[in-house]
Amino acid sequence: MEQNIISTIRDECIRHRSKYLTIAQLTAIAEAKINEFIITGKAKDQDLSSLLDKCIDILSIYKKNSKDIKNIISCKNKGAMISSNSVMIIQLNYVYYKVIHIIVTTNIPHLSEFAKIKLHKSTSDEGNGNNNNNEFQLMNIYNTLLETLLKDENIAKIKSFIKSSIKQTKLNHEQEECNLMRTGSYITSNQLNSLISSSANSTSSQMEILLIDIRSRLEFNKSHIDTKNIICLEPISFKMSYSDHDLEKKSLITSPNSEIKMFQSRNLFKFIILYTDANEYNVKQQSVLLDILVNHSFEKPISDDFTKIFILESGFPGWLKSNYGSQVSSSSPSNNNIKDDSVYINGNTSGLSLQHLPKMSPSIRHSMDDSMKEMLVAPTPLNHLQQQQQQQSDNDHVLKRSSSFKKLFSNYTSPNPKNSNSNLYSISSLSISSSPSPLPLHSPDPVKGNSLPINYPETPHLWKNSETDFMTNQREQLNHNSFAHIAPINTKAITSPSRTATPKLQRFPQTISMNLNMNSNGHSSATSTIQPSCLSLSNNDSLDHTDVTPTSSHNYDLDFAVGLENLGNSCYMNCIIQCILGTHELTQIFLDDSYAKHININSKLGSKGILAKYFARLVHMMYKEQVDGSKKISISPIKFKLACGSVNSLFKTASQQDCQEFCQFLLDGLHEDLNQCGSNPPLKELSQEAEARREKLSLRIASSIEWERFLTTDFSVIVDLFQGQYASRLKCKVCSHTSTTYQPFTVLSIPIPKKNSRNNITIEDCFREFTKCENLEVDEQWLCPHCKKRQPSTKQLTITRLPRNLIVHLKRFDNLLNKNNDFVIYPFLLDLTPFWANDFDGVFPPGVNDDELPIRGQIPPFKYELYGVACHFGTLYGGHYTAYVKKGLKKGWLYFDDTKYKPVKNKADAINSNAYVLFYHRVYGV
């Protein structure tokens, strides 16, 4: 088998003209070998025992090779050359791992013998016969293999090696292309990025690349390409008659010494890259500089054999529009020496402003009912927060924040005093000039009852943009047919951290920022003959909305109901779409297209808007059919599913999937597409000193600070609507030392406790199980940094931030994919106040006071109203998904089953034993 795989890998390398194969290519080889050795021929009749033996044999080879791979990777990290034989061993080992993984996780679970053994294990607690002993041994072997795969540390290193090697190969190829180019040629942003990356990793004694920015020093200081060796040569500082000596002695006379030294070494660089902006004079001077360096370098002649001079195609504007537009830096004075953790050490919060939050967020229309008025004067949980400020009659009155937190959002414009209204409650969270805001809302005047805008100062109403502008932006921002180049969005058990930027509440609860929630609100055989494997988007497909005419003044009926066709086991997708569209705030921004203005094509984890725009298209199609149709109809979400599959291959085929995983993927993907901070650098880890100080703070304060740090890298409307946070605290039983991490969530997965024969299980029981203090087993004990060894320890989760819309996943499947069918009783009105961290003790970090930490809507009580239930029937391998969704007072609850939907006669039907994912939104005054 080994020689066969090696031969296949070599053939593929020759075919692709590459020393390395990609992860996808190696996975395809593994799948082919499984078909060849496991499924076809004589292997077709192999039983569970034979498959397990095959896996054990392959695993032993994998483990043996892993020892050699550690040495290979270690040598590579030290800069040593890697032989072709070593590369083959690494690629071979990946194929071995993938073969075992596919057999254990896919092939074996589909064996009838495996299903019978699981059934016997779950239904029989008696008997010790040979058959049962044999079955027990087989299951032990299977579980051991599965655990070995999950805990294997080598595969991550192998994948990292393969990916980095492929990246380096690509860089080398592009650099070779540059080596063949002549001085004076134009290079693309891709080629420049390759040269910069190659230079950063180069071990050569020759200096690699020097960039010369031909713009004014002011523009250069504002923003320039981020690289080590770069100088600014102002276009006005030289002329055609200059030589290289004149450039050094005259043009650079006021430049920093570091730039002068770089220019003095210009003839030692392998590449010199010139770039400027679109200014006509600057472009002309760029040509003049090229001529000086090539033809008038008398003091230090530049040889084309040693140093090549290129011009950046499309200049700096082209670089900004490219995939590397985020790789820019500023030379202006800054606080770059301030660490992210300085807020804990000396109370300096200005470090957070280094990563800019967006100026705008999507606008959402909504009305506040009378229950909100009561909340506006409710007390806050922090001792130092005062009651609501009296209404100000002066229209120029603007509430401000104090101390260093004013710097946090210093890039935003102040609100226009003319937009203020003396009849509105003076809510600082809606008028702070220096804070970003998540969502502008509409709320009635508490005196007149009229619908007046509550203005987030920096956020215009997006629906005022014309449809023409929207369509233009669509075409400019996205090539809809570039699915093949989309990086996958990896769905996690709890979605990737995402944050919102809701402004600070001053003196009283921030409830209006939460009032968006005031609105009420599969695994089956295919019901369609369409084969997903045949589905494709033609080159003519585009995301136009010519079939819909959204206007700024249109009053959408957000409670529309339309069925969705099953494309082959796609009920898992249909039920989640129906529930998600029960979230009025989200539906609104995709109907009025205000989302489009916030697509961030430079977001590192986004799909360049593919997912968001095809989701918008689906919402428009559903709304149009509901509006125009006179009877119950359904539509096909085929193109949306294709878009999902292009982003994550898990949803590409017609195989069965978990609806909660799709829910996490969808919200995570929409967030990344709309993430206004998606190109910001990641947060630095806290120093030991900062972490020690954080541990002394209450969860209430520490979690607020961590949320503020979070905001600097992730901010979108998805975050603002669905994001929460919990704390995970480890505690040593010997010395009582603690360590706490703060984890954001979009879908909160809670366990189902064991059923007490006397009592039913409630969702509150599940939350108690989720937040209980857990004693860690011997093999899970924490390595206490204070004791410097593993000690008896505990772990406890605490919810520190509850979102506007809470999605709860009932964990019905265990690690062996067995389903817990116990009836979990969940109410229409859920109170989670007891589970929210409310431990504020009056202690703040040094130098920080109560005026500086935003509350961001975290004011109890936390009551939630049910508006959606995704139900699962059957097993994970053969079941079906449906949904109950609340569609307002007029339509009430509807039951969705793919293409079919019907009113629910008794709303109590929404409370049922098949509930799997629950959708709640926060309500007030109840």
UniProtKB/Swiss-Prot annotation:
GO biological process, one term: proteolysis
Free-text activity regulation comment from the record: RFU1 is an inhibitor of deubiquitination activity.
Function description: Ubiquitin thioesterase that acts at the late endosome/prevacuolar compartment to recover ubiquitin from ubiquitinated membrane proteins en route to the vacuole. Also removes ubiquitin from soluble proteins targeted to proteasomes. Is essential to maintain a normal level of free ubiquitin. Involved in the ammonium-induced down-regulation of the GAP1 permease and the UME3 destruction in response to oxidative stress. Has a role in the RAD9 checkpoint response to TOP1 poisons. Required for promoting coordination of DNA replication and avoids DNA overreplication.
Key words, A-Z: Cytoplasm, Endosome, Hydrolase, Membrane, Phosphoprotein, Protease, Thiol protease, Ubl conjugation pathway
Chain's gene name: DOA4
One MF term in the entry's GO annotations: cysteine-type deubiquitinase activity
Phosphoserine modified-residue sites: S443
Species name: Saccharomyces cerevisiae (strain YJM789) (Baker's yeast)
Name the record gives this protein: Ubiquitin carboxyl-terminal hydrolase 4
Subunit: Interacts with BRO1, RFU1 and VPS32. Associates with the 26S proteasome.
